[in-house]
Amino acid sequence: MFLYVVCSLAVCFRGLLSLSLQSSPNLCPGVISTPYTLTCPSNTSLPTSWYCNDTRLLRVTQGTLTVDTLICNFSCVGQSGHRYSLWITWYAQPVLQTFCGQPSNTVTCGQHVTLYCSTSGNNVTVWHLPNGQNETVSQTKYYNFTLMNQTEGCYACSNGLSSRLSNRLCFSARCANITPETHTVSVSSTTGFRTFATAPTLFVMKEVKSTYLYIQEHLLVFMTLVALIGTMCGILGTIIFAHCQKQRDSNKTVPQQLQDYYSLHDLCTEDYTQPVDWY
Protein backbone atom coordinates (compact mmCIF):
# COMPACT_ATOMS: atom_id res chain seq x y z
CA MET A 1 0.00 0.00 0.00
CA PHE A 2 2.90 2.33 0.78
CA LEU A 3 4.34 1.72 -2.69
CA TYR A 4 0.95 2.54 -4.22
CA VAL A 5 0.81 5.86 -2.35
CA VAL A 6 4.36 6.74 -3.46
CA CYS A 7 3.54 5.97 -7.10
CA SER A 8 0.35 8.06 -6.92
CA LEU A 9 2.24 11.01 -5.47
CA ALA A 10 4.88 10.63 -8.17
CA VAL A 11 2.19 10.99 -10.84
CA CYS A 12 0.61 14.02 -9.15
CA PHE A 13 3.88 15.78 -8.43
CA ARG A 14 6.05 14.63 -11.32
CA GLY A 15 8.08 17.83 -11.07
CA LEU A 16 9.73 16.42 -7.95
CA LEU A 17 11.28 13.69 -10.06
CA SER A 18 12.57 15.91 -12.88
CA LEU A 19 15.85 17.01 -11.30
CA SER A 20 18.59 17.56 -13.89
CA LEU A 21 16.39 16.15 -16.66
CA GLN A 22 17.95 16.86 -20.04
CA SER A 23 15.69 18.50 -22.61
CA SER A 24 16.21 18.49 -26.35
CA PRO A 25 18.93 21.01 -27.29
CA ASN A 26 17.82 24.47 -28.34
CA LEU A 27 19.85 25.35 -31.44
CA CYS A 28 20.95 28.99 -31.44
CA PRO A 29 22.47 30.46 -34.64
CA GLY A 30 25.23 32.93 -33.76
CA VAL A 31 27.39 35.31 -35.78
CA ILE A 32 31.13 34.74 -35.62
CA SER A 33 32.92 37.32 -33.41
CA THR A 34 29.60 38.85 -32.36
CA PRO A 35 28.27 38.65 -28.78
CA TYR A 36 25.22 36.44 -28.43
CA THR A 37 22.89 36.47 -25.44
CA LEU A 38 21.48 33.14 -24.32
CA THR A 39 18.24 33.11 -22.34
CA CYS A 40 17.40 30.16 -20.10
CA PRO A 41 13.89 28.90 -21.03
CA SER A 42 13.05 28.24 -17.35
CA ASN A 43 10.93 31.46 -17.25
CA THR A 44 12.06 32.40 -13.76
CA SER A 45 13.86 35.37 -12.23
CA LEU A 46 15.37 33.20 -9.50
CA PRO A 47 19.09 32.27 -9.58
CA THR A 48 20.05 30.07 -12.51
CA SER A 49 23.03 27.74 -12.81
CA TRP A 50 24.92 27.78 -16.11
CA TYR A 51 27.21 25.03 -17.41
CA CYS A 52 29.80 24.92 -20.18
CA ASN A 53 30.35 21.32 -21.28
CA ASP A 54 29.01 20.19 -17.85
CA THR A 55 31.43 22.53 -16.03
CA ARG A 56 29.53 25.01 -13.88
CA LEU A 57 30.14 28.74 -14.44
CA LEU A 58 30.24 29.80 -10.79
CA ARG A 59 30.03 33.57 -11.31
CA VAL A 60 26.92 33.48 -13.50
CA THR A 61 23.55 33.27 -11.71
CA GLN A 62 21.33 35.38 -13.98
CA GLY A 63 18.75 34.05 -16.42
CA THR A 64 20.82 35.29 -19.38
CA LEU A 65 24.39 34.63 -20.49
CA THR A 66 26.29 36.62 -23.13
CA VAL A 67 28.98 34.74 -25.03
CA ASP A 68 31.33 35.59 -27.90
CA THR A 69 32.39 32.67 -30.10
CA LEU A 70 33.01 30.42 -27.12
CA ILE A 71 33.16 26.77 -28.15
CA CYS A 72 30.81 25.22 -25.60
CA ASN A 73 27.65 23.23 -25.34
CA PHE A 74 25.80 25.38 -22.82
CA SER A 75 23.08 24.26 -20.45
CA CYS A 76 21.15 25.95 -17.65
CA VAL A 77 19.26 24.71 -14.59
CA GLY A 78 16.52 26.76 -12.93
CA GLN A 79 15.06 26.42 -9.44
CA SER A 80 12.72 23.66 -10.64
CA GLY A 81 15.75 21.48 -11.35
CA HIS A 82 14.91 21.09 -15.04
CA ARG A 83 17.97 21.24 -17.28
CA TYR A 84 17.91 22.92 -20.70
CA SER A 85 20.59 22.49 -23.37
CA LEU A 86 21.50 25.51 -25.51
CA TRP A 87 23.81 24.77 -28.42
CA ILE A 88 25.24 27.61 -30.47
CA THR A 89 26.18 27.15 -34.12
CA TRP A 90 28.38 29.97 -35.38
CA TYR A 91 28.05 31.29 -38.95
CA ALA A 92 29.59 34.05 -41.03
CA GLN A 93 27.26 36.91 -41.97
CA PRO A 94 24.46 36.98 -42.85
CA VAL A 95 22.85 34.82 -40.15
CA LEU A 96 19.13 34.28 -39.69
CA GLN A 97 18.32 34.07 -35.99
CA THR A 98 15.34 33.45 -33.75
CA PHE A 99 14.90 33.55 -29.98
CA CYS A 100 17.16 30.88 -28.56
CA GLY A 101 14.46 29.92 -26.06
CA GLN A 102 12.15 29.30 -29.03
CA PRO A 103 14.11 27.19 -31.54
CA SER A 104 12.47 26.07 -34.76
CA ASN A 105 12.10 22.47 -33.56
CA THR A 106 9.90 23.48 -30.62
CA VAL A 107 7.50 26.00 -32.20
CA THR A 108 3.94 24.70 -32.44
CA CYS A 109 0.98 25.72 -34.57
CA GLY A 110 -0.40 29.14 -33.66
CA GLN A 111 2.74 30.46 -31.96
CA HIS A 112 4.39 33.73 -32.92
CA VAL A 113 7.88 33.58 -34.40
CA THR A 114 10.34 36.46 -34.69
CA LEU A 115 13.19 36.18 -37.19
CA TYR A 116 16.20 38.50 -37.25
CA CYS A 117 18.79 38.73 -40.00
CA SER A 118 22.10 39.58 -38.34
CA THR A 119 24.32 41.34 -40.88
CA SER A 120 26.30 44.53 -41.37
CA GLY A 121 24.64 45.17 -44.73
CA ASN A 122 21.59 47.37 -45.13
CA ASN A 123 20.03 45.80 -48.23
CA VAL A 124 18.43 42.92 -46.30
CA THR A 125 15.88 40.47 -47.66
CA VAL A 126 14.19 37.68 -45.73
CA TRP A 127 13.15 34.78 -47.95
CA HIS A 128 10.49 32.13 -47.51
CA LEU A 129 11.51 28.97 -49.35
CA PRO A 130 8.37 26.83 -49.80
CA ASN A 131 8.91 23.86 -52.12
CA GLY A 132 12.21 25.25 -53.37
CA GLN A 133 10.71 28.61 -54.40
CA ASN A 134 12.17 31.94 -53.25
CA GLU A 135 9.43 34.21 -51.87
CA THR A 136 10.29 37.61 -50.42
CA VAL A 137 8.51 38.16 -47.10
CA SER A 138 10.47 41.10 -45.67
CA GLN A 139 13.05 43.65 -46.72
CA THR A 140 14.02 44.57 -43.20
CA LYS A 141 16.14 42.74 -40.65
CA TYR A 142 13.08 41.62 -38.69
CA TYR A 143 10.22 39.38 -39.77
CA ASN A 144 7.34 38.42 -37.50
CA PHE A 145 4.78 35.72 -38.36
CA THR A 146 2.44 33.12 -36.88
CA LEU A 147 3.24 29.48 -37.58
CA MET A 148 0.49 27.72 -39.53
CA ASN A 149 0.09 25.65 -42.69
CA GLN A 150 0.59 28.66 -44.96
CA THR A 151 3.74 29.90 -43.20
CA GLU A 152 5.56 26.64 -42.49
CA GLY A 153 8.73 25.78 -44.33
CA CYS A 154 12.28 27.13 -44.40
CA TYR A 155 13.46 30.74 -44.17
CA ALA A 156 16.76 32.42 -45.04
CA CYS A 157 18.06 35.95 -45.54
CA SER A 158 20.57 37.82 -47.69
CA ASN A 159 22.42 41.10 -47.18
CA GLY A 160 22.93 42.32 -50.75
CA LEU A 161 26.72 42.21 -50.36
CA SER A 162 26.99 38.76 -51.89
CA SER A 163 24.77 36.16 -53.51
CA ARG A 164 25.18 33.82 -50.56
CA LEU A 165 22.11 33.06 -48.49
CA SER A 166 22.24 32.70 -44.74
CA ASN A 167 21.63 29.54 -42.78
CA ARG A 168 18.11 28.12 -43.02
CA LEU A 169 15.58 27.99 -40.20
CA CYS A 170 12.83 25.47 -40.91
CA PHE A 171 9.45 25.27 -39.19
CA SER A 172 6.92 22.47 -39.49
CA ALA A 173 3.25 22.79 -38.50
CA ARG A 174 0.24 20.50 -38.72
CA CYS A 175 -2.62 22.84 -38.05
CA ALA A 176 -6.37 22.90 -38.36
CA ASN A 177 -7.81 25.28 -40.94
CA ILE A 178 -6.61 28.65 -39.65
CA THR A 179 -6.69 31.85 -41.66
CA PRO A 180 -3.29 33.57 -41.61
CA GLU A 181 -3.20 37.02 -40.06
CA THR A 182 -1.55 40.08 -41.57
CA HIS A 183 1.27 41.72 -39.64
CA THR A 184 2.29 45.35 -39.87
CA VAL A 185 5.85 45.65 -38.61
CA SER A 186 7.74 48.85 -37.86
CA VAL A 187 11.49 48.25 -37.80
CA SER A 188 14.42 50.25 -36.55
CA SER A 189 18.04 49.14 -36.36
CA THR A 190 18.25 50.54 -32.82
CA THR A 191 14.79 50.13 -31.31
CA GLY A 192 13.82 46.78 -32.85
CA PHE A 193 10.25 46.28 -33.97
CA ARG A 194 6.66 46.78 -32.90
CA THR A 195 3.73 44.67 -34.11
CA PHE A 196 0.48 46.61 -34.55
CA ALA A 197 -1.70 43.68 -35.58
CA THR A 198 -3.15 41.64 -32.74
CA ALA A 199 -3.42 37.89 -33.06
CA PRO A 200 -6.69 36.05 -32.34
CA THR A 201 -6.65 33.17 -29.93
CA LEU A 202 -5.80 29.97 -31.77
CA PHE A 203 -6.95 26.59 -30.61
CA VAL A 204 -5.08 23.50 -31.75
CA MET A 205 -6.97 20.24 -31.43
CA LYS A 206 -3.86 18.34 -30.47
CA GLU A 207 -3.10 20.70 -27.58
CA VAL A 208 -6.72 20.63 -26.36
CA LYS A 209 -6.73 16.84 -26.40
CA SER A 210 -3.45 16.73 -24.52
CA THR A 211 -4.80 19.12 -21.88
CA TYR A 212 -7.97 17.02 -21.51
CA LEU A 213 -5.96 13.83 -20.98
CA TYR A 214 -3.74 15.64 -18.49
CA ILE A 215 -6.75 16.77 -16.43
CA GLN A 216 -8.42 13.36 -16.69
CA GLU A 217 -5.29 11.61 -15.46
CA HIS A 218 -4.91 13.85 -12.42
CA LEU A 219 -8.63 13.64 -11.62
CA LEU A 220 -8.40 9.84 -11.59
CA VAL A 221 -5.39 9.93 -9.28
CA PHE A 222 -7.15 12.43 -6.99
CA MET A 223 -10.26 10.24 -6.73
CA THR A 224 -8.08 7.20 -6.02
CA LEU A 225 -6.29 9.06 -3.23
CA VAL A 226 -9.63 10.18 -1.74
CA ALA A 227 -10.90 6.58 -1.76
CA LEU A 228 -7.66 5.38 -0.16
CA ILE A 229 -7.85 8.02 2.57
CA GLY A 230 -11.51 7.12 3.23
CA THR A 231 -10.63 3.43 3.60
CA MET A 232 -7.79 4.22 5.99
CA CYS A 233 -10.09 6.47 8.07
CA GLY A 234 -12.67 3.66 8.28
CA ILE A 235 -10.07 1.17 9.48
CA LEU A 236 -8.75 3.67 12.01
CA GLY A 237 -12.28 4.36 13.29
CA THR A 238 -12.94 0.64 13.76
CA ILE A 239 -9.71 0.25 15.74
CA ILE A 240 -10.55 3.25 17.95
CA PHE A 241 -14.09 1.97 18.60
CA ALA A 242 -12.81 -1.49 19.57
CA HIS A 243 -10.23 0.05 21.88
CA CYS A 244 -12.84 2.26 23.58
CA GLN A 245 -15.20 -0.71 24.00
CA LYS A 246 -12.43 -2.76 25.56
CA GLN A 247 -11.47 0.12 27.84
CA ARG A 248 -15.08 0.56 28.99
CA ASP A 249 -15.44 -3.15 29.76
CA SER A 250 -12.22 -3.17 31.76
CA ASN A 251 -13.51 -0.33 33.96
CA LYS A 252 -16.66 -2.23 35.02
CA THR A 253 -16.86 -3.89 38.45
CA VAL A 254 -17.37 -7.62 38.89
CA PRO A 255 -21.12 -7.29 39.78
CA GLN A 256 -21.68 -5.17 36.66
CA GLN A 257 -19.94 -7.73 34.49
CA LEU A 258 -22.07 -10.55 36.01
CA GLN A 259 -25.22 -8.50 35.46
CA ASP A 260 -24.31 -7.95 31.79
CA TYR A 261 -23.58 -11.65 31.42
CA TYR A 262 -26.94 -12.82 32.85
CA SER A 263 -28.82 -10.14 30.88
CA LEU A 264 -27.23 -11.42 27.68
CA HIS A 265 -27.97 -15.05 28.73
CA ASP A 266 -31.65 -14.30 29.37
CA LEU A 267 -31.88 -12.50 26.00
CA CYS A 268 -30.43 -15.48 24.16
CA THR A 269 -32.66 -18.11 25.89
CA GLU A 270 -35.89 -16.11 25.90
CA ASP A 271 -37.11 -17.43 22.58
CA TYR A 272 -36.57 -21.05 23.64
CA THR A 273 -38.51 -20.86 26.96
CA GLN A 274 -41.82 -19.71 25.48
CA PRO A 275 -44.74 -22.18 25.88
CA VAL A 276 -45.68 -24.09 22.78
CA ASP A 277 -49.35 -24.32 21.76
CA TRP A 278 -50.40 -27.71 20.41
CA TYR A 279 -53.29 -27.90 18.10
From Swiss-Prot:
InterPro entries listed in its UniProt record: HHSV-8_K1_cytoplasmic_dom, K1_C
GO terms (BP aspect): symbiont-mediated perturbation of host apoptosis
Membrane-related topology note: Single-pass type I membrane protein
Gene Ontology annotations for the cellular component aspect, listed alphabetically: host cell membrane; membrane
Compartmental location: Host membrane
Task of the protein: Promotes host cell survival pathways and may contribute to pathogenesis by preventing infected cells from undergoing apoptosis. Acts in host B-cells by mimicking the activated B-cell receptor complex. The cytoplasmic tail of K1 can induce the phosphorylation of a number of different kinases, leading to the activation of survival signaling pathways.
Keywords: Host membrane, Host-virus interaction, Membrane, Modulation of host cell apoptosis by virus, Signal, Transmembrane, Transmembrane helix
Protein source organism: Human herpesvirus 8 type P (isolate GK18) (HHV-8)
Chain ranges passing through the membrane: 221-241
Pfam families: K1, KSHV_K1
Binding partners and assembly: Homooligomer.
Protein's name in the database: Protein K1
